[in-house]
Design a protein with these regions (language model features):
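NAD(P)-binding Rossmann-fold cofactor-contacting core
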Residues: 131-149, 289-291, 295-296
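Rossmann-like adenosine-cofactor binding region
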Residues: 148-216, 337-343
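Adenosine-phosphate binding glycine-rich loop
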Residues: 31, 195-258, 399
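Glycine-rich adenosine-cofactor-binding loop
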Residues: 7, 89-94, 101-102, 106, ...
Length: 420
């Protein structure tokens, strides 16, 4: 192996994609489940340069002949370069987190910062916050140690913090939907930063957005930034414009990996347009209504007849949460998906939402849709749901012309979303 990543578990790593997109060299993922395997690998030194992830960022320091002062102060190395048999250790997580905060206008000067978690990434983010002038940095733990000045999550809510940083795995794929801090009860918050990058928006970030926190950002751009700075060490050269490269690769990753969800009234064209979009973009097509039928074994009219709309909506939420946490899908949603906020969180966590807007007079009546029994029913439904569609959507796609027109409008909207 020349270049690559070592760690105990690497199943969901994006590092290979990022490095090969950035530099074109072959980048291996090398899982080393045990400490013995990690030590044997490091002792052989049969690589040019590697990145190191959990749980070996501290262990690798034992094998380094030189450790960058910043990495030494943090107590963790995530980038190792082999120079004629001598290992040189650096910490580009610091640089990546600093870039993320700078890029999104997070100002630490004079602020109170709470950091969720006590692991290695805590030390990295704490160093950045202190170096950028934070007045106070507080540590939050599920099992706080008063002798270390640690706070509980309940105490963090009343800490007066302006900035929250999450360094725990709470809300990380596949265990999405977890949020241990009530950010809505922290009115002075200016920024919430989560180092978790899968899903794109954790439950913490989604709730911060709902609470109106000015800056709420996940960790994907940090991941890309630390990789770019690691590649500079790998190749012993600076990129001409690293921030531009970071933005380019982050946008490309989101475009490639995020879901696209289509919402709108029954018979507005979500399924037909969705299949075309999925084919054009190379995504897996998912029809949530079809998945409900597959899982339950009954038709939608039969579910409504037996359990009512509430029973159907519960099943709809289950399927939305099942598919919403995955990636690279085109998801066609039922017309009533917007009636439950948890559905929208599930769709937004790892995707963008397009509202397919078709004139109500062009919608179909009946057709096995229990709530579309008449045109009057459709008009009433549209009046109730339209504000919800508009609030949920990242873009509105008119569908009052040809299918090609709608497809073109959707592609243009996606370009604008992913390139912004």
């Amino acid at each position: 192996m020349e270049y690559g990543l070592i760690g105990a578990k690497l199943g969901h790593s994006y590092s290979k994609i990022i490095h090969e997109m950035l530099c074109g060299y072959h980048y291996d993922l090398c899982p080393l489940p045990t400490e013995e395997e990690a030590r044997a690998f490091l002792a052989k030194r049969q690589f040019k340069a590697i990145n190191v992830t959990i749980p070996y960022k501290k262990l690798v320091m034992e094998y380094c002949s030189y450790i960058d002062p910043r990495a030494k102060a943090i107590g963790a190395v995530n980038t190792v370069v082999n120079k004629n048999g001598l290992l040189y250790g650096y910490n580009t997580d610091y640089m990546g987190f600093a870039h993320l905060c700078d890029a999104h206008g997070v100002s630490f000067a004079g602020k109170t910062v709470v950091i969720l978690g006590t692991g290695g990434t805590h030390n990295t983010t704490s160093a950045v916050a202190r170096d950028k002038g934070a007045a106070k940095v507080l540590t939050v733990s599920r099992h706080p140690d008063p002798e270390k000045g640690e706070l509980s999550y309940a105490e963090a809510v009343s800490s007066g913090a302006q900035i929250v940083i999450n360094t725990t795995p709470a809300g990380m794929y596949p265990n999405v939907g977890v949020c241990n801090l009530d950010v809505a009860a922290m009115p002075g918050l200016e920024a919430v930063v989560d180092v978790v990058y899968n899903p794109d928006k954790t439950e913490l970030i989604l709730r911060a957005e709902e609470a109106g926190v000015p800056v709420a950002v996940g960790g994907l751009e940090m991941l890309v930034a630390q990789a770019v700075y690691a590649a500079e060490y790998f190749l012993d050269r600076k990129f001409e414009d690293a921030p531009v490269e970071i933005r380019r690769i982050t946008a490309a990753l989101r475009r490639d990996m995020l879901n696209i969800a289509l919402i709108g009234m029954p018979s507005c064209g979500k399924t037909t347009l969705g299949r075309l979009l999925a084919k054009s973009l190379g995504r897996t097509f998912v029809d949530l209504d079809e998945e409900i039928v597959k899982t339950d074994g009954r038709s939608i009219p039969d579910i409504f007849a037996a359990e009512g709309e509430d029973g159907f909506r519960t099943k709809e939420t289950t399927e939305t949460q099942r598919f919403g946490k995955e990636g690279r899908q085109l998801i066609s949603c039922g017309g009533g998906i917007v009636k439950k906020p948890e559905n929208l969180r599930a769709l937004h966590q790892n995707g963008v939402i397009l509202f397919i807007d078709r004139p109500v007079d062009a919608l179909a009546v009946g057709g096995g849709r229990p709530l579309s029994s008449s045109m009057d029913a459709l008009r009433q439904m549209e009046a109730q749901r339209r504000p919800l569609y508009l609030a949920a959507a990242d873009a509105v796609i008119p569908n009052n012309g040809t299918l090609d027109d709608a497809l073109h409008a959707a592609m243009e909207a996606l370009d604008e979303i992913f390139d912004s």
